[in-house]
């Protein structure tokens, strides 16, 4: 279901690329609206559909077509789940630098199409940087191929990038070729806590500007800490840093981070070993679907895109707005990447519905910082009153 709506003409479940092309062609000829569906973890993103005829279930297209460990490349069908692919790659001590939410359910195609970001982007780049080739199905059933299975520099347009974050509006992703990354010989995380909000952000930017190459970095409040399993004090801010490298380089980065933390007024520094860090990053990645505490899953999720230098001031302003509205909330940020995730909790729909003006005020704050704000989760009743995609900023005359 998408915003409570079921496909009026049911599901189509192709088992290979040619069958998927036939389904799309038939829908095109019949003027039927179809929606590509993978694991269904991101179907709530976007405006309600005016028409919904067919759900094109791609989850049966879940094979690894080719895998060349020596070349660090692989080609897979879009219906394979993230965890299934990562398990295959782990046998050769490699991984795909894409860590979207709910990897046991989310498919490769859906993760790319919805641009479901995780925390590995700090060092390893955006998920579009891992894609080297793609096969897509256009809305008229025509198959299109771009790129290939070789990592090399070529001239021309990288058309696959258009489909990452397009939510299937430009075509259905059928197959994807990736470049892979070796797993570091030693990995671990460090949790640094601060008594002041500004100190946590200044420290994060110092890490960003320094000689450390973390795999991931996240900054969050005490509410966020308790939800992912870190027992922090109320009113404290935590910075969680994931690092990975060879033994000596790992120890050197730990030393640099400890020095930076001390010079920025940290209250505590904890080194978390690899076997203990995995559940923390998993909980952080799946923060929006975590229902294990008294707050439950957030009713509203907003994602702001800013420059790294604007994150601190923008988050401070958003916190002021939400404190004034007296609703429970938590904010997770990636200062080095310029991303803010705003989670608002509320039990009653009527209570959340009253936040329309608050959400518009938050968006104005983000826009003043030259950023954009997308609401990835909203109650259905609010989607007609709140600009989900920040289209007013993209089209100032409208």
Region roles according to the model:
Residues 9-13, 74-76, 188-193, 237-249, ...:
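Short cationic amphipathic helices and targeting signals
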């Amino acid at each position: 279901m998408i915003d409570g709506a079921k496909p009026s003409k049911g599901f189509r479940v192709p088992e290979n690329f040619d069958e998927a092309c036939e389904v799309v062609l038939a829908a095109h000829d019949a003027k039927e609206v179809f929606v590509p569906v993978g694991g269904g973890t991101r179907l709530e993103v976007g405006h309600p559909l005016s028409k919904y005829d067919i759900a094109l279930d791609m989850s049966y297209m879940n094979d690894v077509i080719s895998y060349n460990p020596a070349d660090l490349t692989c080609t897979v069908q879009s219906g394979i789940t993230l965890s299934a692919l990562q398990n295959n790659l782990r046998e050769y001590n490699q991984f795909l630098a894409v860590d979207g939410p709910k990897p046991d359910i989310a498919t490769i195609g859906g993760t790319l199409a919805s641009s479901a970001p995780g925390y590995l982007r700090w060092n390893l780049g955006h998920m579009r940087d891992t894609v080297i080739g793609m096969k897509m199905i256009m809305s008229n059933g025509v198959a299109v191929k771009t790129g290939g299975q070789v990592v090399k520099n070529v001239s021309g347009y990288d058309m696959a990038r258009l489909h990452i974050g397009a939510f299937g509006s430009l075509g259905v992703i059928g197959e994807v070729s990736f470049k892979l990354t070796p797993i570091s010989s030693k990995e671990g995380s460090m949790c640094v806590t601060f008594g002041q909000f500004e100190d946590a952000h200044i420290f994060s930017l110092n890490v960003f500007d320094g000689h450390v190459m973390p795999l991931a970095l996240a900054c969050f409040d005490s509410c966020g800490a308790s939800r992912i399993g870190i027992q922090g004090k109320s009113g404290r801010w935590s910075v969680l840093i994931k690092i990975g490298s060879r033994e000596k380089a790992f120890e050197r980065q730990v030393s640099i981070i400890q020095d930076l933390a001390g010079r920025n007024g940290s209250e505590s520094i904890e080194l978390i070993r690899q076997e203990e860090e995995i559940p923390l990053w998993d909980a952080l990645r799946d923060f929006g679907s975590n229902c294990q505490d008294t707050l439950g899953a957030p009713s509203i999720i907003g994602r702001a895109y800013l420059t790294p230098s604007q994150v601190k001031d923008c988050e401070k302003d958003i916190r002021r707005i939400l404190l004034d509205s007296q609703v429970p909330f938590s904010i997770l940020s990636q200062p080095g990447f310029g991303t803010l995730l705003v989670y608002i909790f509320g039990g009653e729909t009527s209570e959340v519905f009253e936040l329309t003006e608050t959400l518009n005020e938050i968006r104005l704050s983000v826009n003043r910082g030259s950023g954009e704000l997308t609401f990835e989760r909203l109650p259905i009743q609010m989607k007609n009153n709140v600009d989900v995609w920040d289209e007013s900023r993209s089209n100032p005359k409208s």
